UniProtKB/Swiss-Prot annotation:
PROSITE patterns: BSPN_CSAB (PS51862). Residues 54-91 form the BetaSPN-type CS-alpha/beta domain. This is Potassium channel toxin MeuTXK-beta-2. InterPro entries: Long_scorpion_toxin_alpha/beta. Belongs to the long chain scorpion toxin family. Class 1 subfamily. GO terms for cellular component: extracellular region. It holds the Pfam family Scorpion_toxin_alpha-beta. Residues 1-19 form the signal peptide. One of its GO terms (biological process) is killing of cells of another organism. GO terms for molecular function: potassium channel regulator activity; toxin activity.
Length: 91
């Protein structure tokens, strides 16, 4: 039952995030919808981590460059799931 609830909440968050809702909205929803327990802590951590990732980075090659040009006027580089502006990948 808990697994179904987690999957349902996650899919709902993904759907709502495409409508412009931000991490703070989801954190507030999890706080009121899920009773205080380990499950709530795990969900809040997942919401935070998903909120910090930029999935467009790995799916669309020009995403980071567009993102960094908009905010810092620098060249963008994809580091895993995060964009770094002006910091090339170093191996």
């Amino acid at each position: 039952m808990q697994r179904n609830l987690v999957v349902l909440l996650f899919l709902g968050m993904v759907a709502l995030s495409s409508c412009g809702f931000r991490e703070k909205h989801f954190q507030r929803f999890v706080k009121y919808a899920v009773p205080e327990s380990t499950l709530r802590t795990v969900l809040q951590t997942v919401v935070h981590k998903v909120g910090k990732t930029q999935f467009g980075c790995s799916a669309y090659q020009g995403y980071c460059d567009d993102h960094c040009q908009d905010i810092e006027k620098k060249e963008g580089f994809c580091h895993g799931f995060k964009c770094k502006c002006g910091i090339p990948m170093g191996f």
